[in-house]
């Protein structure tokens, strides 16, 4: 499949042939598994001190006192200790470090999931179904010249996004930023932020600095491209801006 390459003014300058990876069959099941596997590998194992709740001098007072025969503090027989239902006692079933809390995925399945997610970015119906505003986008998949990599001013990237037709989607992401319900507000994740366009480049020459302040916009190099960037929340079809160099690098990696 041939697509046009646009300059920073939104004008077509040439045509290129897309790599075969953009013809990969759509596999939402593998994409979902790969994203969840990536999530779970960020979880830190939990455990408890094996001696927690057991560092008390206790005794069993035996029967004949009109009290339950549980371990009690030696100096204060009135207070139970050590047992799970006592104040300061041990946990009944504490979390174990040995618990398997991550999900694995085979290497070939992960590779196929990334390839399928890349192909989904070129599917107009999937991009629109994901919620992106694509009415004014000049082309899907959107390929631009490598000059985009050198833009390091936020004002410049704003004008480029407007000329390429993706600014409406950034406005959507800005409007959909909401305060999170629950205690997550206190734990460093106060806002729920929508995902906007993804910019994939061959090499960062300033574009990260130029695009990072736009709501919902992510920038990543092809070599660091993962399924979480392409399908946030396990939902494939993210609106993606590819540079020409990134397309050529994809051809080298995936064919």
Curated annotation (Swiss-Prot):
Keyword check for ATP-binding, yes or no.
no
Q: Which GO terms describe its biological process?
A: translation
**Do you know which Gene3D superfamilies this protein is assigned to?**
3.40.1370.10
Q: Name one GO molecular function term.
A: structural constituent of ribosome
Highest taxon of source: Archaea
Q: Pull one GO CC term from this UniProt entry.
A: cytosolic large ribosomal subunit
Q: Note the InterPro entries from the entry.
A: Ribosomal_uL4 (IPR002136), Ribosomal_uL4_dom_sf (IPR023574), Ribosomal_uL4_euk/arc_CS (IPR013000), Ribosomal_uL4_euk/arch (IPR045240), Ribosomall_uL4-arc (IPR019970)
Q: Which keywords does this Swiss-Prot/TrEMBL entry list?
A: Ribonucleoprotein, Ribosomal protein, RNA-binding, rRNA-binding
- Subunit description: Part of the 50S ribosomal subunit.
Report the family membership.
Answer: Belongs to the universal ribosomal protein uL4 family.
Task of the protein:
One of the primary rRNA binding proteins, this protein initially binds near the 5'-end of the 23S rRNA. It is important during the early stages of 50S assembly. It makes multiple contacts with different domains of the 23S rRNA in the assembled 50S subunit and ribosome. Forms part of the polypeptide exit tunnel.
- The protein in question is named Large ribosomal subunit protein uL4
The gene behind this protein is rpl4
């Amino acid at each position: 499949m041939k697509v046009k390459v646009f300059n920073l003014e939104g004008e077509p300058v040439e045509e290129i042939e897309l790599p075969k990876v953009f013809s990969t069959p759509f596999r939402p099941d593998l994409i979902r598994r790969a994203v969840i596997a990536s999530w779970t590998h960020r979880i830190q194992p939990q455990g408890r001190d094996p001696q927690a709740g057991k560092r008390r001098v206790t005794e069993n007072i035996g029967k004949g006192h009109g009290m339950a025969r549980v371990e009690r503090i030696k100096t204060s027989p009135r207070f139970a200790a050590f047992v799970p239902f006592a104040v300061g006692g041990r946990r009944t079933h504490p979390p174990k470090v040995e618990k398997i809390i991550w999900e694995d995925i085979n290497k070939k399945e992960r590779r196929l999931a990334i390839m399928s997610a890349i192909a989904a970015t070129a599917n107009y119906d999937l991009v629109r179904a994901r919620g992106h505003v694509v009415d004014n986008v000049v082309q899907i998949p959107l390929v631009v010249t490598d000059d985009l990599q050198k833009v390091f001013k936020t004002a410049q990237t704003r004008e480029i996004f407007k000329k390429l037709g993706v600014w409406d989607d950034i406005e959507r992401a800005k409007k959909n930023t909401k305060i999170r319900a629950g205690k997550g507000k206190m734990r460093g994740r106060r806002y729920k932020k929508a995902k906007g366009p993804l910019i994939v480049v061959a090499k960062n020459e300033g574009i990260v600095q130029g695009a990072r302040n736009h709501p919902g916009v992510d920038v990543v190099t092809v070599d660091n491209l993962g399924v979480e960037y392409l399908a946030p929340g396990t939902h494939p079809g993210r609106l993606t801006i590819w540079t020409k160099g990134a397309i050529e690098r994809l051809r080298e990696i995936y064919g």
